[in-house]
């Protein structure tokens, strides 16, 4: 189906008694979604070419001689679709029974349990028992390489994984091998699922046939708490869900957003979560005086920090993965005190997902380089260049090279606002513990200027506070009045002060984000040029 | 003729006239027998005029579906600027059917001529003849005939000096029944797994290589040259007076428990009883006919009572609850166990399922397992209901009709020969091992 | 291809050795074979369309389609090895393992079944010394398999030995027939 344009005529039909009006060429399945009717399906996925093979989405279309596969049937004017007609339900019941005849029914030891579409639809409309009395087919578990394990006995051959690798990843390492009921998902010996985006086949698999080796036997899906977030592994800003069990992040999964990442998350991003749970955190504010480093309460620590900074030129070394809000308050400090803000950008090889326009694991391996630049921070390999005697430095969640540490020795004061203690740091006059980004709310700006919210997925350790909250307090302690009791207030302060964000509101961003005005135009012309 | 036997006087030999005549295989021999006159004529005609003659003849597809050939050709949008393709379906693999094999073995030029005419009629410059890999001799004969025709300029970039390009290529299959399904054949020709495609789009809109394509059976295409030479009216006359919907002659492959198995060419509407007893010589000595599958294994089984009143055309077979299909007639005598044969058929379909649709992949295998268990003496009364319910799930719900084809003989077998299945169950052995309950 | 006691017999995932030898792989598509493939490519608008013919060339040259040959064929036609494997395993005529010098296929589908094809199979298993379907005889000369409908139902039972198509085989004719295939 080609994407509808403004000129595509609308088609009117009735689905489950509801009036539906959708662009011509829309499938019945997608049309039904628009009025809140979910037609059961397995092989269909909106991001993949239609296969029409599972036959689970059969629906009754009045006056049609046969049941229609809703995924592969386009809407027609005046159509009356009965999803729950007796014969459609019977047909789907038959499909469900057949999908289970060779299935090991091993839900108690299956990772997919609880988020398995085979379970869901069987509960919803399957048979209570099975009439199958013959021996079951058996095939051994296979390691597909990468993070993927294949359990063929649970496979329903929907071919979503094969189509993803063929049509989206453009790396056809999976196939359907053999035919009839001997068929299975196969690969070629020695050619593994090592594509940087291959892990998506695990999410695409509607059943427990493709599993993440990383997540294997880690948690039952119903024990997980799920939080909408944004990946900070690179500047793409893929939308994701952070899944925690007992305040521990155990899995990251993509959250669909067709403006940014479609349905996908790369392997680098999805496996980049262990640091979120790290135990060696700074948990309490400290103040260093002649008598040594002491824990302090927040008020004392903040006023000590302000005292250390007051009247000096301030250099800010800020992580490019800080939120827009935190960077904004830091930019205030730089502006008031004079000095400069800078960051070093970690990089790695770029890895595009060719089947989706403008989607890649980006070379810039931090979430908010664009935000930092918009806020006046300089991207440089020598972030402390120009630091002179008497200047003060604030290091905000930024790791330090030995050279950085050497430069810091010239500083008159060092304030560390961080989740962790940089190994190379010799001294800090004040240390202020902050939450990492999955422990707080905030926004990132991706490389195309798309501003997106992330929510709090776990509790911060000890006395750590959200970064923007701490930095707003520091502004206040320095006499620059900032109001940021909530993330929304912090964003409002940012939007009021930073021209790029003018007119945006925290609520207005929603969970899919908004693009900075003018930011995409440049990109569009760039795309045309290439 | 009832090849390999001498023709029966009641046969009407149009396509089979030269079966067994080795000289007819050569280009010169074919020309001497009137060959390529039709092509010469066709190349000078407007494609629409050719379509009109074929429409007028009433020729219907001989591969099984019986779709009117001229109408199918007319779906091709001429002059749309896209390359058009003709596919000749020579993947004859429907159990019981072996007529296309003889056409290709004995009259390869009849097929090439038919292909070239059809290609011109649908605006195609390329025709592919997809022959199943097991047909080593027909492949060889067709390859040689194509080469001969190409060398002589009968086909190629200036076919018969007409200035029109008609390439005809032979493409060898590699062992898959389902590639006889038209869209599976196209996938196979494109170098893919032979998976049937979802329709729409239909081949005339997006077929081979995504381009407008017409696909015709060997026998259909071989019938085109005589129709063009003799006119549609001539062909139309070969039919029952009361049924103008089935016209022309039809090759019937007859096999199984019959005295003279072979290929017979009769006019549409021929009485089936006379056909089986007179032309085919009746049952083997001392035996009686018991059942017939008249149109290839995918059509319902009929009893002899039904067969005796059947007329051999599309409508005549439907009237007795079966179909003409590919006219592959499998005859079974009273020594055969229907459950055993139905189980064997089911196994065939389970083996050949492409694995795409759930009902087919799982249903054909499950049906086979139940039937084989019943035949082994371990059936239960519930198996009847399960088989019928599976057959319902397997009918009309999948991309292609392979699973329907598996269900048809099961349902008709159970309905018409239920006693034989029941006998298996009443005699059944006692379970010594508890059944595995899913 | 399933030859087990049920239609679903046999494990789908093959763990059998593929007859790998330590010798380096010698490419199929060189010289004259490559020229034949190149000529063939002109018949089709896509390279992929030449996959089935190319695999036939491999089987002609090597007697079977080895994993290395799948990879090579893929490379020549711009396809991944996994894709080629998916295609190879779909079609029953490509051998995924080495077979005997003479590959015997006996049709046993319904029309032949009613004419006693099972006995023909038994005769072949006995006289070739294979004993079992799909097993190559100890002397490496024969492999016998059952095959689904060969499309010569009126000439029951048709048998293919290598590329020879033999009609109307009965159990009695088997020993004489095998003499031609030493």
Predicted segments, located by residue:
Chain B
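Histidine-anchored nucleotide/phosphate-binding helix
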Residues: 107-121
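Short acidic, glycine/serine/threonine-rich loops at helix termini
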Residues: 65-73, 97-100, 139-144, 179-191, ...
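Hydrophobic alpha-helical positions that pack around
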Residues: 139-268, 280
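Cofactor-/ligand-binding subdomain signature composed of acidic, glycine-rich
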Residues: 1-51
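Short amphipathic, charge-patterned alpha-helical segments
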Residues: 114-118, 268-285
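Conserved phosphate/anionic-ligand binding catalytic regions in large, soluble enzymes, centered on
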Residues: 54-75, 118, 173-187, 191-193, ...
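Gly-rich Lys/Arg/Thr-decorated short loops/hinges at beta-loop-alpha junctions or inter-strand turns
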Residues: 24, 30-37, 88-100, 203-209, ...
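Ferredoxin-type iron-sulfur electron-transfer modules in oxidoreductases and energy-metabolism complexes
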Residues: 37-56, 82-84, 90, 99-104, ...
